[in-house]
Amino acid sequence: MQLLAIGINHTTAPVSLRERVAFPLEQIKPALGALRSHLSGRSGTEAAILSTCNRTEIYCATDVLTPGTDGFEHTLRWLSQHHNVPAGELAPHLYALPQSEAVRHAFRVASGLDSMVLGETQILGQLKDAVRTAGEAGSLGTYLNQLFQRTFAVAKEVRGQTEIGAHSVSMAAAAVRLAQRIFESVSTQRVLFIGAGEMIELCATHFAAQQPRQIVVANRTVERGEKLAEQLSGQGLTANAIRLTDLGERLHEFDIVVSCTASSLPIIGLGAVERAVKRRKHRPIMMVDLAVPRDVEPEVARLDDVFLYTVDDLGAIVREGNAMRQAAVAQAEAIIESRVQNFMHWLETRSVVPVIRELQTSGEAIRQAELERARRMLARGDDPEAVLEALSGALTRKFLHGPTHALNHTQGEDREALLRLVPGLFRHSSHSER
């Protein structure tokens, strides 16, 4: 069984490409079924899909994906067809990691070493959600289950034994820093949050600490927006919720807009922002789009009075704190390397299980056949001593037939290898078992 991780992330592809191969949550289960069917349709193929604002990754365990074969191309072709993105456009940004490289990558991702925000913890929760979804879809098996359980254990070990999360500048904190660079004081600004998920909650908490003049939460289901607004109001702020459909009429009221929804299409168009800017009499408006796919049409960035930032734009601010954690990175990498070797040892032992089962099945078939023959001999009155002699002789000949035949018909290096191997296979204790 071969392991494979294929994907793109914030270091290999811009957000304009990442958003085109992102998987909305409701599409992941059917996508897993389609992927497994595409990979030769074998029921033994295991798969999981991780899709976040910074990465889209596919993890597979199958016997048809091996380096140097069409396996990598199969998965690339499926990803290309599923998202209607030309393979030639996607391939230069894709990484394909087999076996130990896939294991190492999974460990690094879960530990926050591969994140834009070095050491961030949100990715671990996202990976756990991806594994849970794959489990519900029935696409996990022995190999990926073991990989991810060890992945979660390694992430816990890394965070517990290193300071990888220290001095971390989160995306939410970076958004606040940007606002402080544009506006003299966040406390005099009106802030709109679009969405009510985990990322928006984190951003709202950071902005709330700056005591803005007003906070409004716009969400498709107003109840969720109201719940977040209530949490923020408890911090002595003026916060309320509106429906997403009210955006067009209310957008001009806000100086800062932070958006992160799961929409597959932009929810703020160029025309809506142009009208808002006009009604604001060209006072500047800052927009932070943390969604992938993007919530704000990219053409909005061309407007003179709009400062539009995406997740990629926030990367420079985030990286300012990364250099301070390089010692922790070295410690984390050492832990991960050790755990990769442990997992690969487990994987290698798993590879012999089918062979052992086949040997056991073959041996049992021989035993049953010779036992039945011995019973027939006893039933017709043959001497028991002769029957036992015949039984033991037949078992010995049949068990040794395979190795003997191989030794007689193998040549060159293969024969030399067998000559070294066979004696060890048939070595037995000098003390008979009783």
Curated annotation (Swiss-Prot):
PROSITE patterns linked to this entry: GLUTR (PS00747)
Reaction catalysis annotation: (S)-4-amino-5-oxopentanoate + tRNA(Glu) + NADP(+) = L-glutamyl-tRNA(Glu) + NADPH + H(+)
One of the record's GO molecular function terms: NADP binding
Residues that coordinate or bind NADP(+): G195, A196, G197, E198, M199, I200
Active-site residues annotated for this sequence: C53
GO BP terms in the entry: protoporphyrinogen IX biosynthetic process from glutamate
Enzyme Commission number: 1.2.1.70
Annotated site, Important for activity, chain positions: H105
Pathway participation: Porphyrin-containing compound metabolism; protoporphyrin-IX biosynthesis; 5-aminolevulinate from L-glutamyl-tRNA(Glu): step 1/2
Superkingdom per UniProt: Bacteria
Sorted UniProt keywords: NADP, Oxidoreductase, Porphyrin biosynthesis
SUPFAM superfamilies: Glutamyl tRNA-reductase catalytic, N-terminal domain (SSF69742), Glutamyl tRNA-reductase dimerization domain (SSF69075), NAD(P)-binding Rossmann-fold domains (SSF51735)
Annotated residues for binding of substrate: T52, C53, N54, R55, S115, E120, T121, Q122, Q126
Keyword Oxidoreductase: yes
The protein's assembly and partners: Homodimer.
UniProt function note: Catalyzes the NADPH-dependent reduction of glutamyl-tRNA(Glu) to glutamate 1-semialdehyde (GSA).
Family per similarity comment: Belongs to the glutamyl-tRNA reductase family.
Domain notes: Possesses an unusual extended V-shaped dimeric structure with each monomer consisting of three distinct domains arranged along a curved 'spinal' alpha-helix. The N-terminal catalytic domain specifically recognizes the glutamate moiety of the substrate. The second domain is the NADPH-binding domain, and the third C-terminal domain is responsible for dimerization.
NCBIfam families membership: hemA
Further remarks about this protein from its record: During catalysis, the active site Cys acts as a nucleophile attacking the alpha-carbonyl group of tRNA-bound glutamate with the formation of a thioester intermediate between enzyme and glutamate, and the concomitant release of tRNA(Glu). The thioester intermediate is finally reduced by direct hydride transfer from NADPH, to form the product GSA.
HAMAP family, A to Z: Glu_tRNA_reductase
Protein's name in the database: Glutamyl-tRNA reductase
Taxonomic path: Bacteria, Pseudomonadati, Pseudomonadota, Betaproteobacteria, Burkholderiales
